[in-house]
Structures are given as C-alpha cells and as structure tokens.
Amino acid sequence: EEKAAVGVPERWDYECDVAVVGSGTVLTGAGKAAAAGDKVIIIEAANQVGGTTATSNGQTWMPLNSTAMADNLDDRDDALAYITATAAGKSTPEILDAFLTYGPEAIDFLAETADLSWEISPRIDYHYDVFPGAKDQVRTIAPVGKQSTEAGQMTGAFGTTSSGSYVTAPLADGIVNKYGGEILTETTAKRLITRVNDEGKTEVVGVQAETKKGTVNIKASKAVILGAGGFGWNDEMKRQYMEIPANRTMEVTTCKGEGILMGQAVGADLALMPYAWGQVVCVDPADMPYHEWCDAPPEYNDFGL
C-alpha cells in the first residue's frame, strides 16, 4: 500500500504504465514502451507535439547505422575509437559500448515505427577529422518521410529538405492510434511524485502537472521518462551553468529546464551541465531572418516553422 507521507495524492487523475515528460526525442522511448505493450501517457507543455526536434532538420549522428553498414562504410573499432576520443574521459566504457550497440537499433526502430527511411546527410556531417576513427559522410543521417506541416517544418532553411517532423509526427501518431497511448498537450510537468517503499527507499510513482484547468496527478506504475528538453529559456539556469553568455537559443520556448529541476528535487545527480551543442552566429541588425527564427516557436513563426 502506498505511503502518503511523501506526497502521494489521494486520487489519481490519470493512470498508465509509463509517463513520458516531453514529446521531442523522448518519443523514441515512448514509442518503444508503447510497442512493448505498455500504456503510455505523454505530457507536453506546448500546444503541439514534437518539441525542438520537430523544428530541427531531423538529422542525427549515429555510427554503425544500417544505411552506412549496408555498404560497409563504417567499422565498430573505428567508431569506438572516435567516440572514446571525443568523450575525453567524461563517459564510461559501458556507456560508450551501449551507445554503439543500441543506438543503431533505435534508428531502425524509428524507421519502422514512423514509416520513414534514413539517408546519409547530403550536406552537414558533424565530426572532427583530427580524432582517430573519424569518417566523413557516413555517420550523420537524415530522415526521409512524409512532410508534416502541423508539427513544424524546416525545409530548405539550411540547404536540406529533411525535417524533424518526419520523425515526431508519425511516431506520435503511431503511439496514439496504433498502440493506444495518450498525449496531454498544454500540460506542464512540475513535480515527480514519490513514495517510500517497503525497503525504505524513495521511488518515483508519478508526475504532477499543471493545466489550464488546474493540477493533475498522473500515476506511472513502471517508469517516468524525463525528456523535457534543455534550459534555453531559463535565464537563471543559463547563468548558473553556462560558462559563456548564451543570448539566443534554437530551442522552443517550453524548454525551461523543468525536467532537470524535477530530477534534482528528488536527489538526481547532474553531469555535463556546461556542455551544449551550439554555433557561432554573426548578427546583422539590418537583415537577420536567422536571428529572428532562433527566437520563434513553431506556432508563431511567419514561415510556418
């Protein structure tokens, strides 16, 4: 029987096996759980699914992907040497091995579940030539799928016609319509609900969230997956963790660090907080469409992004 002393509510508004906070890249975990037969509820702060992933160009960096391996373009030893060098001692052999083992499987799962294919990126390839095991035009892949105007589209903005919405839109659709999952939009997760089990250990049993109608409590019998994005729109967290000023962000405006703060509140450790993917941008005050795009969430961008 649950112990209410740690904040377990007397009544649950929703119940599921796996509660997922966010709807960008974390949809991969949501989709995997749903495909395995778990009842999934996705909690999304925005009024549409996809997060920053939907407004991206959809490309991902994955060694040993099936597209490259079909032509024997990659090698596990080379890939391991490369990611070991780039990790620079900030990871573990076990994590690096798991990335190379299960990462390509995740890419194949997305292709099957979201009804898309992957191609070697025709333009952008993120890598450092100076590191051992580096390869060009092999490991950065882009989704090829059906255009989704609802989830957000970045066609042609940076010389590519790929879109993150090729992944997020059909994946979310499959979670709901194929596997019976549920998506709660305009629902902002605020707190992890915990209890003390019979062994005296604190465990997460659900999520408390805020909606326009008030507070809701969502029970998760198996797991809560946090994937609510970064903290690009939280000035206090940027001052705390970033070593240089970060005045602009390409994250959607719902990325305020809630997932990180919720984890901290129940004792989770943090790592690599000062590190982020970024790029140097020269701002021309007279003509700055890119600059404006960085601050525009999908629902407000004049170009429909």
Region locations from a protein language model:
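N-terminal Rossmann-like FAD-binding beta1-loop-alpha1 element of flavoenzymes
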Residues: 16-42
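Glycine-rich FAD pyrophosphate-binding loop
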Residues: 35-56
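Extreme N-terminal leader/targeting segments of oxidoreductases
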Residues: 1-18, 35, 169
